[in-house]
Design a protein with these regions (language model features):
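A conserved mid-protein helix/loop that constitutes part of the nucleotide-sugar donor-binding site
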Residues: 23, 202, 206, 211-225, ...
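Short, structured helix-loop element that forms part of the nucleotide-activated donor/catalytic region
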Residues: 50-57, 231-257, 268
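A short helix/loop element that forms part of the nucleotide-sugar donor recognition site in Leloir-type
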Residues: 53-55, 186-198
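An aromatic- and histidine-rich active-site surface loop
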Residues: 76-90, 94-123, 127
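Nucleotide-sugar donor phosphate/pyrophosphate-binding loop at the beta->alpha transition
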Residues: 80, 117, 128-147, 187
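Membrane-proximal helix-turn-helix segments that form the acceptor-binding/catalytic region
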Residues: 87-90, 113, 136-155
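Acidic donor-binding loop of glycosyltransferase active sites
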Residues: 153, 274-278
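Carbohydrate-associated surface elements
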Residues: 161, 180
Length: 278
């Protein structure tokens, strides 16, 4: 019988229904496990934004879960958990180590040093994000980017722009593999009507993390200058950028067509998708 390919993954907080990296890792891992691969996810310990339903599960849909030691403090949780995950994957019996995001890729050298094949998925040029503009965080993440270029056997990017960036900056060839999207369950407007007064085709939807690099302030400014009876629904959490959330709300003042829902999930999220005009 052929030996199953053993794959370790880290970089996510934990398997979770919400969160960009977390969704990608969960969908990728469960599909690989379904196809016969041995998949282990090294998850962060301590406080998390979501996914509590997976905390007590050693196995989830065929994916083995391991929680690594984590210094549960701002600025240290991601670094410490990634370091321990890299150590565990380097010394474990894995054929491939798949690292997600630039920060965790700082430790790509460790499994590579012990003979593992290393894949890094770049989910964005993280060191350029506003919350990492200066200090240790930006330098650490940028070094992670460089380590991905140097030590990874293969690098995956999610956009053509990032692919061009790696080619122009480092001369590094990458694989362009955009994220897939699960079709949401189609639902009639009910919860969103009761809570927000929204009906089918009555609103334009923005859904995502509320961070400056997504250009949301331009969306708000542009919408305020449009004559329409549609609402602008901005759905998502602030992701450690509460000051930017307040900036957006100040910018939207005086226009009651602009609605902030906060973090949404489950049936509420499906309804927002199903009934948006755009």
């Amino acid at each position: 019988m052929d030996k199953k390919l053993a794959v370790a993954m880290f970089g996510q907080k934990r398997l979770s229904r919400e969160g960009g990296v977390e969704i990608v890792v969960k969908e990728l891992c469960t599909r690989m496990a379904r196809d016969g691969y041995e998949v282990t996810c090294f998850n962060r310990g301590g406080h998390h934004v979501s996914g509590a339903e997976y905390d007590q599960s050693v196995e989830y849909k065929g994916v083995r879960q391991k929680t690594v030691p984590t210094i549960d403090a701002k600025g240290l949780a991601a670094v410490s958990s990634s370091g321990f995950a890299a150590l565990c994957s380097a010394f474990g019996r894995y054929d491939v180590v798949h690292i997600h995001a630039e920060g965790p890729a700082f430790f790509a050298w460790l499994p590579k040093l012990l003979g593992k094949r290393v894949v890094v998925t770049i989910h964005g040029i993280d060191w350029q994000r506003e919350k990492w503009k200066s200090g240790f965080g930006s330098k650490y993440i940028r070094q992670g980017e460089k380590n991905a270029v140097k030590y990874a056997d293969e690098v995956i990017v999610l956009s053509k722009g990032v692919q061009d960036y790696f080619k122009e900056t480092y001369g590094r060839e990458t694989h362009f593999i955009p994220n897939g999207v699960n079709r949401p369950q189609i639902r009639e407007a009910s919860l969103i009507t009761d809570k927000f007064g929204l009906k089918k085709d009555s609103y334009i939807l923005f859904l995502g993390r509320l961070v400056p690099e997504k250009g949301i302030r331009y969306l708000v400014e542009a919408f305020k200058n449009v004559k329409t009876d549609k609402k602008l629904v901005i759905a998502g959490g602030s992701s450690d950028t509460d000051s930017f959330m307040e900036e957006l709300k100040d910018l939207a003042k005086g226009d009651d067509r602009i609605l902030f829902t906060g973090f949404v999930q489950g049936a509420m999220l499906d309804e927002l998708y199903s009934n948006a005009y755009i």
